[in-house]
């Protein structure tokens, strides 16, 4: 169950694997270092084991976040997915912004207040990324030259709101505008375009590299 493409950095991934091996050696009472290495016959097998471990961890976090959303009556407004790298919260653009605007609605602030508490509880030791996305309909605005600028401004608005209203460390938060480059639905229909207009917040697994 996940969205997006999992892309690994070769060097950092190998460092993670080395740490994984070291931890396994320190924590095993009855196994030698060579025994730990012999469990895997290649770097690819080690990488697969690490990814599987991260996937299980992120699945547990995603389930916990989903339960928190249900308790806060946000399950219909915020969807949750996960990969081996991160747990993702996705919100429709219409929930947060008026058409062509980067100013948060009052309703959006109420939702982000609750999402912020969840991020404080489960993402305070992680890198958190905020991404803005649009459909592929060209924007005609004196404020924004294109959808790329609009999506960037929307991600920044969410970033500023969270840094002002939560205890999250701003240095742990990232923001980016993706324009219409990463659609999750068919832009040829209104329903698809509505799904593509969104903001995603990702809580990265501490053992992965942002």
Whereabouts are the PLM-identified features?
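Periplasmic OmpA-like peptidoglycan-binding domain that tethers envelope proteins to the cell wall
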Residues: 61, 90, 96-123, 133-210
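Juxtamembrane linker/hinge segments adjacent to a transmembrane helix in small membrane proteins
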Residues: 1-86, 92
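Short beta-strand elements
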Residues: 74-82, 126-129, 171-174
């Amino acid at each position: 169950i996940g969205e997006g493409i999992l892309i690994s950095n070769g060097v950092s991934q190998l460092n993670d694997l080395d740490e994984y091996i070291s931890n396994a050696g320190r924590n095993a009472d009855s196994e030698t270092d060579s025994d730990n290495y012999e469990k895997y016959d290649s770097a690819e097998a080690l990488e697969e084991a690490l990814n599987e471990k991260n996937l299980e961890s992120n699945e547990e976090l995603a389930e916990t976040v989903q339960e928190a959303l249900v308790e806060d009556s946000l399950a219909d407004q915020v969807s949750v997915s996960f990969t081996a790298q991160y747990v993702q919260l996705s919100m429709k653009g219409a929930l947060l912004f008026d058409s062509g605007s980067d100013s948060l609605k009052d309703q959006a602030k109420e939702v982000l207040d609750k999402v912020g508490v969840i991020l404080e509880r489960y993402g305070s030791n992680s890198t958190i990324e905020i991404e803005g996305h649009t459909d592929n309909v060209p924007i005609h605005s004196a404020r924004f030259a294109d959808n790329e600028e609009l999506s960037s401004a929307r991600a920044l608005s969410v970033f500023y709101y969270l840094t002002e209203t939560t205890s999250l460390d701003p240095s742990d938060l990232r923001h980016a505008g993706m324009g219409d480059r990463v659609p999750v639905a068919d832009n040829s229909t209104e329903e698809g375009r509505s799904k593509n207009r969104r903001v995603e917040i990702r809580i990265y697994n501490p053992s992965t590299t942002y």
